[in-house]
Amino acid sequence: MKQLYTIISLLFLFTHTAWAQQHEIFNQRIRTLQVVGGTNWLSLPVSSLGSEPIHIDFDDMTHDYHRYSYKIEHCDANWNVSASLFESDYLRGFNGNQIIEDVEQSINTNHPYTHYHLAIPNADCQLTMSGNYRLTVYDDNAENEEEGIMFTACWMITEPQPLVKLKLEATSTTDIDIQKTHQQLKMELDHSQLRITHPNQLNIVVLQNGRWDNAVINPKPDYLSAGKMSWQHVRALIFDAGNEYRKFEFLDTDHPTMGIDAIDWDGSDYQVKVMTDNPRPNYVYDEAAKGSFYIRNSDNVENNNTCEYAQIHFTLKAPKQPGDVYLNADWTYGRFLPEYRMEYDEMTKTYHARLFMKQGYYSYQYLMKMEEGSIRLLPSEGNFYQTQNKYNVLVYYRAQSDRTDRLVGYGELK
């Protein structure tokens, strides 16, 4: 038993800085990339082996057909390619030269585009191993492979039956005097079905609202017993509670819908002004989607190829901050890029951003990136323990005979 405690304790001394499941777009033609497990667009892109497919959707902002092929790679818990695996270890069928065949041109839209859809598994390839996956999409008509890379998309596949049991609870009772602004995540993990003999065999990732910028990797448990771990009062699992995500719904080009202040046509684009986001000194419950988005219009028919694109204008009323202010959501793919950075207007004391976006429902928040790279909440957005945050826990395991990490447990607390 003492040896087990030593192994488990060593496990949680290991730290990782490269962990991140992030989609990445390399070509400006690609817009509205969405990766969904089954029909659950409100959660992480997760599915269990042999169950619901992973859906990858995106738009190419032309009406020209492009021959897009894809390659699937298995990744370890740290999102490095599982170099020790052969393709046949994790995939049955074909990989690398298969073409995305589900293609639709937009109909009667101001900006023409072509919508592409891919489901994994499909008739050409089926996944046979749990874990992390990365898909790379190429334009086969490009002059070389580097120029042909359009984007990468990531998702997770769990075991058909979980090999661990997770129990999650969020509470405002914390170990430090911040009960009004923070949440303590408590966890219990039953790993009695696993044989753990080395600290590198188990890896645990904790996410708040699907964010990887504040992910907690391998938090050290405060209670250990045979086959079980427990995190009850762990400082690493105390999160800023923040505030409810903001949201808007752009469904109609003629009439403002939820959260839209005005819609104008300038002769070439629809200019859509989201209502000004004012400071929030008090908590008010509002059911939002924690950064998720859903493409649709008022007709809600053939959304993939009938929705319009428009220039969406965001305005945040706030004092000038010591760091750069960014829009953050699933649809920014967790990336702090210049296009998501807001500009400050000293005259009006407001931040502004304009993004080219497709009709639909969007939820979002504002985050601040400091000069040294840390990410913080904006004081004007509020920080309240009552906030309905979502927590996800991923449990990876590598048996002694395995050559990569498998995803043996997944938990979500809403």
What are these regions (language model features)?
Residues 110-140:
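Ligand-binding face of N-terminal immunoglobulin V-set domains in extracellular IgSF glycoproteins
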Residues 28-76, 177-189, 299-314:
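Contiguous beta-strand segments within globular domains
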Residues 272-321, 405-414:
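Basic K/R-rich, polyanion-interacting modules in nucleoproteins and related proteins
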Residues 91-116, 212-219, 224, 311-359, ...:
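Aromatic-rich carbohydrate-binding modules that target alpha-glucans
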Residues 77-79, 125, 139-150, 211-212, ...:
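Short acidic/polar inter-strand loop motif in beta-rich domains
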Residues 1-22:
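Bacterial Sec-dependent N-terminal signal peptides
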